[in-house]
Amino acid sequence: MSAKKRLDVLLVERGLAESRSQAQALVLAGLVKGFSKAGAQVDDAAELEVTQAPRFVSRGGEKLAHALDELGVEVAGEDCLDVGASTGGFTDCLLQAGAARVVALDVGHGQLHPKLRADPRVTVLERANVRDLRCEELPFQPTFITCDVSFIGLAKALPPALACAAAGWRALVLVKPQFEAGPADVGKGGVVRDPEVRSRVLADVVAQAPGWGAHVLATTESPLRGPKGNVEIFVYLAES
């Protein structure tokens, strides 16, 4: 009897995805025939079929693409700053949506997909903590900012980035309740299950926006949950 493995692991081992993040994006986009959960335990000998290549280097791209479409946000020609770039899902999505240039900033290193690292439109800022960001480190003043960070709240991550933005900036940021709520509101496994807690977290972010020199244009829930199952919300901001 063959051993079982996670579906996303098998997809990478078979060469059907470049990374587990990309494998998860494929499954969540419905592109792996017969499967709907990336964590499904699958027979090692099972036949797997990917019906279409992924659009983006990671599932983050699918998240951002949905938000752009849902909110009618245009980024063509924009100079962008992607805070918390990681593998580069947001960066990839921005470029495919017509962004002129993107700074991919992340506190880690070596994570950005080689395709993006080699793209002349992308400036890579690694080992860069956004809280310590100096505007002179950026090759331009961003007109559009995205933010997807973990283990830090938006109140700490966003203001330093906005301080470097051009006049009339806009931002589309991902609110992750598990990193915004207090420890008492985060359940087992780091998941916020109570919708009232999520609503309170979102209200807190909206209430803080004026202090960042911003006003909220719209919000939308991401149809793709976080890796542990957390519901996440995009907030669309503009300069006050």
Give the ranges of each region predicted by the language model:
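Conserved class I S-adenosyl-L-methionine
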Residues: 76-86
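S4-like RNA-binding module at protein N-termini
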Residues: 5, 16-75
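S-adenosyl-L-methionine
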Residues: 103-156
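Conserved SAM-binding loop of SAM-dependent methyltransferases across substrates and taxa
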Residues: 87-98
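A short glycine-rich, Lys/Arg-flanked "PGG" loop and its adjoining helix->strand segment in the class I
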Residues: 155-172
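Short alpha-helix
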Residues: 198-212
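Core SAM-dependent methyltransferase catalytic element
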Residues: 224-240
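Short, glycine-/aromatic-enriched active-site segment of Class I SAM-dependent methyltransferases
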Residues: 177-194
